[in-house]
Amino acid sequence: MNNTKKRGVLLVNLGTPEEATAPAVKRFLSQFLHDQRVVDMTRWLWCPILHGIILPIRSPKVAKLYQTVWMKEGSPLMVYSKRQQVELQAKLNCPVEIGMTYGTPSVLDGVNKLQAQGVDEICVLPLYPQYSGTTTGAAYDALAHALRKVAVVPSIQFIRDYHDHPLYIKALAESVRQSWQAQGKGDYLLCSYHGIPQRYADNGDIYPLHCEMTTELLRLELGLDKSQIGTTYQSRFGREEWLQPYTDKTLESLPAKGIKSLDVITPAFSVDCLETLEEISEQGQESFLHAGGEQYRFIPCLNDAPSHIEMMARLVTER
């Protein structure tokens, strides 16, 4: 009996609107914000707020923000994800597909494409270095839901996190050093991670522990003093308390502490997207300079950098 399995890789990320238009953004946000992993409020209370207030108000505003970062080929998140797919497939010499937790292509789309190529063992790599139920947990839910719809369930290897993987830390450090070499070194390196409600962490989500560990390992790799680097959390919405310190408040306060030249990196994001290109690169710079800062350097995500592709390949082949 031939037990040789054909292996493939499914890269999972959050997803993106298909167009930078209010209707497309509304469809995407509706699916995203309906997930109880993301917003755990009681449905009968949350759904009227979501559909009656949030989606009608936020969708046009967010669409305009997307328009400022939209690339010729499409959404930055999708453009860079496809580049990762191509590069990783070439490196591993095996089928690699993309599946988004929300929007298209879905996780089911990715599984179907892999199985159509004869794959019967799938390594699922959610591109969230630090585990959170709101991201990696939601990706696992999407995978489980997708597998309910396939006739033959493939063997699955699921990579939960890689926040402390040596090649991930080295890839981050390389991107920082490249920025220093090209633009100069700032007084301080700010590591901005996507936030989650503080209540989620209080209830056991290990995300902030992973974020803090990533920052510490990056500090050691770069040889920085603890006074030269810090962790903050961005992208909060609503009135609930989220993980602190907040990125936006920190950017406003650093110049008064004597930090006039700042480098900012977003380690939780594997590809550049609205939250990095608009919120951090554009809004963040405006806030820092307005508060008295003089130099602001945004360090892009790892995207399809060779060191990032090498790390992804190692994660897959280690399993």
Swiss-Prot record:
Entry keyword Membrane: no
GO cellular component annotations of the record: cytoplasm
InterPro entries (UniProt xref): Ferrochelatase, Ferrochelatase_AS, Ferrochelatase_C, Ferrochelatase_N
GO biological process, one term: heme biosynthetic process
Gene3D superfamilies in UniProt: 3.40.50.1400
Binding site for Fe cation: H194, E275
UniProt-recorded name of the protein: Ferrochelatase
Species assigned in the record: Vibrio vulnificus (strain YJ016)
